[in-house]
Amino acid sequence: MRLSLLPALSLLACQTPKDPTGPAADPDTRVIVVGAGVAGLTAARVLADAGVDTVVLEARDRIGGRTWTDTVGGATVDLGAAWLHGVDDNPVAAFADGQGLTYSKDRTRWSVLYDEASDAQLGDAAWTAMDDAFEGFTGDLDDLRDDLGEDATVADGRDRWIDDQGLSGKDARLATHAIDQWLVELEYAAPVDEVGLTWVWEEEELTGGDHIPDGGYGGYVDALAEGLDIALDHPVTAITVTDDSVEVEAAGETVTGTHVLVTVPVGVLRSGAITFDPPLSDTKTEALSRLDMGNLEKVALSWDEAWWDGSLEFISADADGAYPEFYDLSDVAGGPVLVGLYGGRFARAVQGTWTDDQIVDGALAVLAEAYNREIPTPSDTLVTHWTTDPYAGGSYTYLPVGASPDDLDALAEPEGDRLLFAGEATVSDHYGNVHAAMMSGLREAHRLGVEDVVTAGLEDW
């Protein structure tokens, strides 16, 4: 993995030229922000705090976008984004610190490793073997790319690497799980036979370790949104840009302004749900055609009392990777709860075809098999559907074969002076993360002329 040699602040400053005489200095400026996710709320918060007339249009009946904190039984669970991936030089952590919000070190305890093929719980040696496979494969990525070329998928690289290592049987199965699930289908949320080998594991990584927002991301989102002019249940369907204004059609209304900032996910832009007049440039539409959205889903299961011991790693005997991880979040959620994660091939297979009851039953069957016991009926359950959500189109962006970070950079470019874009997919070094969404909102607020950010916690950004 490449690590940045520049502080995140310097990187952001290089990407966001400041213009103290720009639109933010004009009292007639009115910015319409499309989307009340972290990117949109960050931009709106910074603009509003700088005195810029700003309105946010949100399609859903809630704010937060792909952050969504809800309760399952007596437990509070993040059903979308759930971690701060690194807290050093992270604007999300800086904002939390400035707002008096807290976060805790992720202390997930993996106590159960179950291999369905051998019908056995595995011990420390198996964990070590998977760690070694992960480190070995990622360490050999450059050589694999040279050997296999630009059209190779991670699955191609995995097969070559396992063959080169002479692995077979259980050793090959453990290595496959580490590469397919840890590296790809839970990290990038996409099928291992679609993610391009060329750019996998090339993003910059913030230091400081993974942390979990205390009480969930909901408190962070509420702090961003406080006092903002937000219209819920306003899905945007059309954006028209003229020489001196913008018109945005939403929920049968026409909202006018001087600038519009579009922060919807790649999945929404690709769907054509929003029409643009004039049409988006060929550069942007071609970039969108190469990018895609991953599919990471969660099934949250709560009980009145915990019956398990720690978190579970489940190695499916099938290639689809059904329910590979269950996190015990009881300590941070305020009640006994397991959250199962699944992505990539399995998520695509079941989303839109299985009912919620079937998804829950499948998760309980995995737990029963792994723990070799009857599982009590949960007191409450909740199943996510990011894959089929029309306002998301998936979980977050990934790079299939043929896509590159240049496509993410193309998404970040304005179309003229009045149509701007933000979102996790517009930050090529950190895409797929909440901090990327916040970075992009800050970038566009600066582009609109906010020189000095006064929002508590973000003054240095």
Predicted regions located by residue number:
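Sec-dependent signal peptide recognition
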Residues: 1-8
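Intrinsically disordered, low-complexity regions
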Residues: 8-9, 458
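C-terminal motif of bacterial Sec signal peptides marking the signal peptidase cleavage site
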Residues: 11-13
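FAD-dinucleotide binding site
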Residues: 16-17, 22-461
